[in-house]
Regions:
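Hydrophobic pocket/interface hotspot
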Residues: 18, 60, 130, 142, ...
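Short glycine-enriched loop/turn motifs at secondary-structure junctions
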Residues: 1-3, 53-54, 124-126, 178
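Active-site-flanking beta-strand signature of metal-NTP-handling nucleotidyl enzymes
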Residues: 2-9, 61, 126-133, 185
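Short, low-order "capping/linker" segments at domain edges
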Residues: 96-113, 220-234
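Surface-exposed beta-loop interaction hotspot
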Residues: 106-127
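An amphipathic, aromatic/His-enriched active-site/gating alpha helix that lines ligand/cofactor pockets
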Residues: 31-44, 63-101, 155-168, 187-224
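N-terminal secretory/targeting leader peptides
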Residues: 46-50, 56, 169-174, 178-180
Length: 234
């Protein structure tokens, strides 16, 4: 199964308008039709609401055999009709009618292992998603000191930590008008506990890099997890 991801900021003062327009439609009387459209396309859509240091962000994921085709078809309908409404909620420059694929985050890491035990069990899993902005001027530090190490000689160890925690991690990099953002997804029987185990096993030098690049102190009390506000399979 393939996954695509996309994170959009919600402008200050627009949270209630966003809830009314987006969630009101998707969770209200249109939910059955919305769910069925995703099922017909063979994708599972999830939406998460995350509180940031300033404002909120909505994280969206689509998973299936061909989620990109569904996304492109969806944008052909949504952007011409709702461009102004979306810009009012999320800001200009986020939604690109001329090239919708360029809006999506790029998957840069996947801990999947065909031998992994969590992939062998035919059981219900859950997924969490987290957005981490990259601080201004820190994108190259993130690429060379975090991502390259995760994908290079440390990848077997990086994967093993995820497998031991019982989760599959997929990481995405998204460019936004305000900079870059990393989207992390963790899927498993208990992804919250798995994520906590990964944080606890993080080497001190890596934790320092996370602080430098994201301004996120892994040793401090963690903020509430993003809330799953829509799941087309529920």
């Amino acid at each position: 199964m393939k996954m695509i991801a996309f994170a959009v900021p919600i402008l200050e003062g627009k949270l209630e308008d966003w809830k009314q327009m987006i969630l009101g439609n998707m969770l209200g009387e249109n939910k059955k039709a919305t769910d069925e459209s995703r099922e017909y396309a063979g994708v599972q859509e999830r939406s998460y609401l995350q509180k940031m240091s300033k404002g909120h962000v909505c994280i969206l994921t689509w998973e299936g055999n061909d989620p990109l085709s569904f996304w492109l078809d969806l944008m052909k309908i949504a952007l011409p009709e709702f461009t102004d409404h979306l810009a009012d909620l999320h800001g200009r420059g986020i939604f690109k009618e001329e090239n919708p694929e360029s809006m999506l985050a790029e998957m840069v890491y996947d801990s999947k292992d065909e031998q992994s035990e969590i992939l062998k069990k035919d059981e219900k899993t859950e997924m969490i998603a987290i957005a981490l902005p990259i601080l201004p001027g820190k994108i190259e530090v993130w690429k060379t000191k975090i991502l390259d190490k995760m994908l290079g000689e440390n990848k077997p160890d990086t994967d093993a930590v995820r497998h031991a925690a019982g989760v599959r991690e997929r990481s995405f990099l998204q460019e936004t008008p305000d900079g870059h953002m990393v989207i992390l997804t963790f899927e498993g029987k208990d992804p919250v506990t798995g994520y906590s185990q990964i944080i606890q096993k993080m080497p001190s030098e890596f934790a320092e890099l996370v602080m430098e690049v994201h301004g996120f102190d892994v040793n401090a009390p963690h903020p509430p997890m993003p809330e799953l506000v829509y799941n087309s399979h529920e």
